[in-house]
Amino acid sequence: LGLATLSTEEARVLAGLGNRWNGRLPNVKNLSPETAAVLAGFKGVNEVVNKVVRLELDGATLSAETVRELARFPGVLLLRGLTQAALSDDMLAALGEYNGGGLGLGGLTALSPDLAKRLATFATKFLFLDDVIELSTEAAQALAGFPGSVSLDGLTELSPELARALGDLRKRSLKGVTSLSPEAAAAVVEGFQGNDLTLNLTSLPADTAKELAKGRYNSLFLDRLTELSDEAAAALGECSLTNLWLRRLTELSPGAAKGLAGLKAAGQLGPTLRLDSLRSLSPEAAEAFAASNITYLELIGLKTLSAGTARALARSKAFSGSLPGLTTLSADAAA
């Protein structure tokens, strides 16, 4: 909505819409505590079956009194336009009481160690700090004390020191990081104690792949990779995994396929390999997969299928047999 002001009566109308309203009021300035009480606590609003699940407001113009009312909101609370200067002690105290679906502090591009330490004491279980583009090791160490999940998707670089300082990486979202040095990858592997590791890497040097292969997790999801060298594939082939997903690869050389064919199971399950976007597969690559220990192979993106590839896949116990994207099939392959 393009509203610049909001009365309590207007707030009751919006709150009464429940989840039919998206909760966005980015242009409203100086929201009063009374109006905030209506939006956040549904004061004076008739019973709504499905209440609004998110509020998005201009946080820079809010008073501490207004924030105290907003802290009662049970859904996700997103405050835009904030700066460290705008976050007074009174406002931080009020925000610290919020225990709804998740707190977003938009506009903060950096965190001082003192502010990070304060945020670590907040009651909420989810912090969205996606505008932060700079984070010192000291601030990361302070933020590591926060027991919930923290989204830091605005960070684009991750040093080994920062990876170690962030604490439990199972609870840290770093979707903006698209490359890792071998040293940073080693730190990620060291700090990640979960089952499924998702990385938004768009490039994967062989040395980095070697470090990732040392991890003790069930699944490795690298779904933004569009290219994979033979050397990096060979390194990934040293992994013991239940699942390896490379769902954006459009091409795979025979050498890379032979490297991936070395995958080993983690425990009793797998390994499974998803290559959903591959458009073609050479007979040599298909032969490598057919002879591997892979238990499930997804190739739903294949556009063409040669006779040699078809014969090799027919011998594979892993190939799912699903080829919904196939547009070209030779007579020999069909036979």
Roles of regions detected by a PLM:
Residues S330-A335:
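Short, intrinsically disordered, charge-balanced linker/junction segments flanking boundaries
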Residues T35, T66, M91, A139, ...:
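Conserved beta/loop motifs at nucleotide-recognition and modification sites
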